From Swiss-Prot:
Expressed by the venom gland. Keywords: Disulfide bond, Ion channel impairing toxin, Neurotoxin, Potassium channel impairing toxin, Secreted, Toxin. This is Dendrotoxin A. Inhibits acetylcholinesterase. Has been described to inhibit both the slowly and the rapidly inactivating phases of potassium efflux. Gene3D superfamilies: CD59.
Length: 30
């Protein structure tokens, strides 16, 4: 599962991975 957010792509990735779990990781691992 690709769970990584940067800026605008984060939204696209988060939706594919799950805004809940991904969002948390993205904040810790930008």
């Amino acid at each position: 599962t690709m769970c990584y957010s940067h800026t605008t792509t984060s939204r696209a990735i988060l939706t594919n991975c799950g805004e809940n779990s991904c969002y948390r990781k993205s904040r810790v691992h930008p």
